[in-house]
Each structure stands twice: as structure tokens, then as C-alpha cells.
Amino acid sequence: QWYRPDYQAVIVVGDIDVDAVENKIKTLMSDIPVPAADAARKETITVPDNEDPIISIYTDPEMQGSKIQLFVKRPALPAQMNNLIYGEMFDVIQAYMTTMENARLQEISMKPDAPFLGAGMGSGEIGVIPTLNATTFVAMTQDGKLAEGFEAIYTEMEKVRRYGFTQGEFERAQNDLMRRAERAYANRNDRRNGEFVQTYLNNYSKNTPMPDAETEWQLDSMLIKMINVEAVNGFAQQVIYPRNQVIVVTAPEKEGIVNPTAEELLAIREKVANAEIEAYEDNTVKEPLIPEGTVLKGSPVKKTAQDATLGTTEWTLANGVKVVVKPTTYKADEVRMSAVAKGGLSILSDEEFYMGEMMPAFNSMSGVG
């Protein structure tokens, strides 16, 4: 019913002898029998609607970290539409929505009193069911703080449903999406084989398009510029609603940790739904980090050294800082920088070393940083 030739495809990408590989595949697979005409076919799975939220709470003594997920289910876009411009436009609108909402959630997570350690929003496929999509909110919280985290993400979801996004948020998201598209096009000749495989696999299994890089760039840049904030807000209202919700909690089962019950989660949901919620206030400063015309005070170069083997240039500055520069052609329009200072684990005693090595993990789990 499932594993049979008419449901299978072989995708090969790489520096190969095409004829030899094709003949090898035919030799290996041609003996697989074709199913009988009356053989059972796989069923199309349809997930039923639900008016009241479905809530699942999973706790385990070995569970690491507390997490709550909120799914708002919806039918998937019909497969025959995935290969049309409408399908690509649908994806771009989703990208706008998730980019703007994730920026809001990140802004909250950076506050000293943030109700979660981290949170995110997604939109699209859910699990392995091709007929089902969902808008998803997820929050990771300190142990025992799931109720606060759930109230926060439900409030943010309700805020988007009621008020949508601002023009300022949209413009920043547009710049971000354009940069992503430009970067993908600039690196079109450096794509890995796995990227091609995934594109062809999606075309076979989901009927998504597989355009060349030039066509993809032209289409995506056109759609990114064509879509406006009203279209995104309209889409958000269509995919965020009180029915078809699923809430999933995963948390440690330990003494002293109190996790919310299903009844408590429903009460939080009801509280937020009936609350007066203010629209998002966009206070982002549009000024550049370094104003144009600013003269930066640097440190003069005292020594220059070349390493022909590594292809690097090392500058030693008057203040003692060493700068190593290596030009590459790996990726177009990309500059990577990192800075390292002496200290850290190297200044700890042998007895303190292992505790110091574990400290970042403890900090992360405790909500620091």
C-alpha cells in the first residue's frame, strides 16, 4: 500500500556518469513488481476540526527544559496550487508574517523580566500530514513558569489577530527578505548537492516549483516588493482564530516544579481573549548605528605579517590587538567577523575548569543571557 514503484522516485545529484548511474538504478530496481491494478492505495489523511482546544501535557523526570506549543490548524494549500505563482506568493506572505512576529518575540525575550527564555512563531506544514498546515507559537520557559509563558504567547497571538503589523515593521521585514533573496542569488553557484536534492524531492512529493536561480530571484524579488502590509494582516486574520487549536506542554516532572493543568491553560486562554490588549507600539529607531560622517578613532598598525600558506594577513595594532584578515570567494556579499580575548577557561585552576566549562549551560537553563 505504501512502498511500491508508483510512489517512489530516485534523485541523484553530483559529479557522476549519468548513463552509468541510470543503468545501475534500472538494474537494481527494474525487478520490483508493479502492484496489481486493484491493489489498495494509500488513503488521504484528513484531520478533523475541533471547536474546543485539544490539550496534551507530557511530563517526565528526564525531560530537559519546559516548553509549550500552540498550534492553530488549517487546511493545507491544495497541491495543484503549489506550482503556481499563487503558491509562491502564499509562501512570501507567510515569510513576512513570521519575520515580523519573531522580531516581536525576540524583543520581549531580551527584557530583564521576560516571561520566556525564548519564543518563536512558524507557519506552514505540521508533521507528516500533507493536508494539514498550522500557525505555530512556541515558548521555552524556566521550569515552573509555563503558565506565564503561555499567557505571553497567547497575548502576542491575539495582538496580531486584532491589530496586525505596522508599516514600520513591514518595511524592516521587506528589507530582511530582500537581503535573503539577494544572498541566495549571489550564492547561486555555490549551492550544495543536498539543496538541489531537497528542491527536487519537494517537487516530486509536494508539487512545489524548481526554477533556476535567475527565475527564482526575479519572481521572489517581484513578490517581496509587490505585497503590502494590508495583505499580510489580512492573511494573519485568516490563519489565527480561536478554533482548531492544539496546546502541547512538555516539562520535567520534579519535586518543587508546578506545571499548569489543562483547566488552568483554558482559563489563561479565556482571560486573554476577553482582555483589553494594546496594539504593538513600534519604537524602533531608524537612525544608523554609526551616523554617516562619524570619524572613528582607531589604533595604528604597528606590524604587518603575511602567511602565504593560510592566505592571511595579520595586523598588530598599537594597543596590542591582533587582527587576522583572510579574503575568500566562498560566499558572495558576506563578511564574517569574530573576536576572542585571553581569559575564560584558561585562567581557571584545574579544580575550577570543569565547573567553568558547564557554566554557560547552567546560565542558559536559568534564564541568564
Locate each region found by the language model.
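M16/MPP (pitrilysin/insulinase) zinc-metallopeptidase core fold and M16-derived inactive scaffolds
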Residues: 99-133, 338, 342-369
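Short cationic amphipathic helices and targeting signals
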Residues: 4, 8-14, 136-140, 246-249
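Hydrophobic, mid-to-C-terminal alpha-helical segments
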Residues: 189-201
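A conserved hydrophobic secondary-structure block that centers on an alpha-helix together
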Residues: 1-8, 19, 365
